[in-house]
């Protein structure tokens, strides 16, 4: 049955621009957009329900394309340490950082991980997020990576959201492989990834390319394994130093390379040539009080698509509002509100390989949208905090919170 959503204005975000339709209407059928356009051009038809959106501005549902939403415990004590002058690298070297979350995650049951993650993700959902990517990477052995990935699949079953699962086994070195990073990479490639993929738990493969994690050569071994399994790749790259990880990601036609504070112009050119999306993570940049900015002007000049994401994680970005990340992306990185909104809609969809079905409001795409009680889409980026009045529609059905 067809449902009519009328009396609205639309920022479709096609081609990464507002692409306005004023005095508009949307017709949904099931979970898809059947028709979209100006109200006066609405085809004559019979509708099972008509919804008055009261002059709202409608945008695509937000896509949070880089999160670590499933984890045990939290790291508020480390937050204090960093404010006392201890660096992220020093915390990691002393057994904190990712290692402390690994311990807490291994100790937690699937049910505990699921319940804590659902609380966080419902906050994101109320902020307008309709699609989310979630990484493993706090288990670091087969049993616990599998546990995390199973929880991610359960989240997709529990919530009316699109949930994409990324295996980030190459996130850090587990304690049982201390000083044996090559052996751990071999274990990931020969044991973990093939088994997890065979169970249908993995949509993409990620790794952390950094001096305190894994080298480009080690990451390439993971990428080759993912490629052999037919899985797309992503990469944490150039967050703390320049190792050429983003160029490596480009060589493997990665969906995205993420963080990118220390990338060079050669890296930018490589990503532009491969179509790899640059995912910027202003929450981590802000919380770590970084001073090295991603090369925004170069990315724009060379036509690299820019996405924004929360990087929701317990250590460096405990961010429960993607809308706040929009403001940070504009304020810290000088993105325009239009560029920021593209970063959590169509460009974020491209970072997940979902651009054919999600990320913009077009006929035939999934009916995920948010109707905002605002006077212009830039307000979504402009207002800091609070809960902007909105109606969230997922797969053609309004979500009641």
Curated annotation (Swiss-Prot):
<protein>
    <recommendedName>
        <fullName>Imidazolonepropionase</fullName>
        <ecNumber>3.5.2.7</ecNumber>
    </recommendedName>
</protein>
<dbReference type="GO" id="GO:0019557">
    <property type="term" value="P:L-histidine catabolic process to glutamate and formate"/>
</dbReference>
<comment type="function">
    <text>Catalyzes the hydrolytic cleavage of the carbon-nitrogen bond in imidazolone-5-propanoate to yield N-formimidoyl-L-glutamate. It is the third step in the universal histidine degradation pathway.</text>
</comment>
<keyword id="KW-0378">Hydrolase</keyword>
<feature type="binding site">
    <location>
        <position position="315"/>
    </location>
    <ligand>
        <name>N-formimidoyl-L-glutamate</name>
    </ligand>
</feature>
<keyword id="KW-0369">Histidine metabolism</keyword>
<dbReference type="InterPro" id="IPR005920">
    <property type="entry name" value="HutI"/>
</dbReference>
<dbReference type="InterPro" id="IPR011059">
    <property type="entry name" value="Metal-dep_hydrolase_composite"/>
</dbReference>
<dbReference type="GO" id="GO:0019556">
    <property type="term" value="P:L-histidine catabolic process to glutamate and formamide"/>
</dbReference>
<dbReference type="GO" id="GO:0008270">
    <property type="term" value="F:zinc ion binding"/>
</dbReference>
<feature type="binding site">
    <location>
        <position position="68"/>
    </location>
    <ligand>
        <name>Zn(2+)</name>
    </ligand>
</feature>
<keyword id="KW-0479">Metal-binding</keyword>
<feature type="binding site">
    <location>
        <position position="75"/>
    </location>
    <ligand>
        <name>4-imidazolone-5-propanoate</name>
    </ligand>
</feature>
<feature type="binding site">
    <location>
        <position position="236"/>
    </location>
    <ligand>
        <name>Zn(2+)</name>
    </ligand>
</feature>
<feature type="binding site">
    <location>
        <position position="311"/>
    </location>
    <ligand>
        <name>Zn(2+)</name>
    </ligand>
</feature>
<feature type="binding site">
    <location>
        <position position="138"/>
    </location>
    <ligand>
        <name>N-formimidoyl-L-glutamate</name>
    </ligand>
</feature>
<dbReference type="GO" id="GO:0005506">
    <property type="term" value="F:iron ion binding"/>
</dbReference>
<dbReference type="InterPro" id="IPR006680">
    <property type="entry name" value="Amidohydro-rel"/>
</dbReference>
<feature type="binding site">
    <location>
        <position position="66"/>
    </location>
    <ligand>
        <name>Zn(2+)</name>
    </ligand>
</feature>
<dbReference type="InterPro" id="IPR032466">
    <property type="entry name" value="Metal_Hydrolase"/>
</dbReference>
<dbReference type="GO" id="GO:0050480">
    <property type="term" value="F:imidazolonepropionase activity"/>
</dbReference>
<feature type="binding site">
    <location>
        <position position="239"/>
    </location>
    <ligand>
        <name>4-imidazolone-5-propanoate</name>
    </ligand>
</feature>
<feature type="binding site">
    <location>
        <position position="138"/>
    </location>
    <ligand>
        <name>4-imidazolone-5-propanoate</name>
    </ligand>
</feature>
<dbReference type="GO" id="GO:0005737">
    <property type="term" value="C:cytoplasm"/>
</dbReference>
<dbReference type="Pfam" id="PF01979">
    <property type="entry name" value="Amidohydro_1"/>
</dbReference>
<feature type="binding site">
    <location>
        <position position="313"/>
    </location>
    <ligand>
        <name>N-formimidoyl-L-glutamate</name>
    </ligand>
</feature>
<feature type="binding site">
    <location>
        <position position="171"/>
    </location>
    <ligand>
        <name>4-imidazolone-5-propanoate</name>
    </ligand>
</feature>
<feature type="binding site">
    <location>
        <position position="68"/>
    </location>
    <ligand>
        <name>Fe(3+)</name>
    </ligand>
</feature>
<keyword id="KW-0408">Iron</keyword>
<feature type="binding site">
    <location>
        <position position="66"/>
    </location>
    <ligand>
        <name>Fe(3+)</name>
    </ligand>
</feature>
<keyword id="KW-0862">Zinc</keyword>
<feature type="binding site">
    <location>
        <position position="311"/>
    </location>
    <ligand>
        <name>Fe(3+)</name>
    </ligand>
</feature>
<keyword id="KW-0963">Cytoplasm</keyword>
<feature type="binding site">
    <location>
        <position position="316"/>
    </location>
    <ligand>
        <name>4-imidazolone-5-propanoate</name>
    </ligand>
</feature>
<feature type="binding site">
    <location>
        <position position="236"/>
    </location>
    <ligand>
        <name>Fe(3+)</name>
    </ligand>
</feature>
<comment type="pathway">
    <text>Amino-acid degradation; L-histidine degradation into L-glutamate; N-formimidoyl-L-glutamate from L-histidine: step 3/3.</text>
</comment>
<comment type="similarity">
    <text>Belongs to the metallo-dependent hydrolases superfamily. HutI family.</text>
</comment>
